[in-house]
Amino acid sequence: SALATKGVKAVALVDMSDGVAEVAEALNARAGRAFAVPFKGNVTDETFRASVFDSISRQHGPVSLCVPAAGITRDELAVRVDKVTGKARIYSQDLFKLVVDVNLIAPVYWALEMIGRIAEDRAAKGLKRWTPGETVQGSVVFIGSISSQGNRGQISYASTKAGLEGAAATIMQEAIFHGVRCGVIHPGFTDTPMVRAMGMDYVAKNILPFTQLGRLIRPEEIADAICFMLTNSAVSGELWVDAGWHAPA
């Protein structure tokens, strides 16, 4: 909702759950206007992705901000040895591919969809390389994770979040030709249903002692960091929003 006060016309909320409509309704009530537009669908579906951009563009003009935040976890040890048989069981390749599709490929292609449309609009106007005398044409913020530095039991999740760092670094170099910025925020353990599902006893024992703040990060603190990266044109690269996390040895 902070974006509503910064001149943003509208925000497309994309999720597979029915709850996306309720979230949009709550944001609109807070903003006092029809600000959030819900879209229910699979972020890995190319046709759905294009339809979201088409719909928002028709209603509110070209998309210039992109925060592809969908993510899943399928956590298991990379290799586990059966105590009875002595046989090693390695992490499921199908699960790995699923996490990569949702957490890495989908975010990159949502960003590229926006950049491609901005590039087409500029080409149609006879514009080529963006110059500092112009306004910034767009901003991308990927949602990384402290797990990008490695985390036990998260071979697939950590790989995708590290992959976003490489994707962002490449997009930063390429997309500025079209006037588009790109960055990554790396949230720490945040007070969300996914983290609470670990059990608060586990959180108290295995997470909080390794944060400087000694508490879970509030979702609005992550939102503030995203808004900061979106709206401050001098900011690029990576921003760690981790409550002073230091991983245990």
Model-derived regions, located:
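Canonical Rossmann dinucleotide-binding motif of NAD(H)/NADP(H)-dependent dehydrogenases/reductases
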Residues: S1-A12
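Active-site-adjacent segment of SDR/Rossmann-fold oxidoreductases
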Residues: K6, T170-V180, S233
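Conserved NAD(P)H cofactor-binding loop of Rossmann-fold oxidoreductase domains
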Residues: A69-K83, G244
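Substrate-binding pocket helix/loop in short-chain dehydrogenase/reductase
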Residues: L77-K97, I207
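A glycine/serine/threonine-rich, flexible loop-to-helix segment
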Residues: R80-D82, F177, F189-T211, A249
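Catalytic loop of short-chain dehydrogenase/reductase
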Residues: G86-Q93, A119-G163, A168-F177, F189
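C-terminal substrate-recognition "lid" of short-chain dehydrogenase/reductases
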Residues: R215-D242, H246
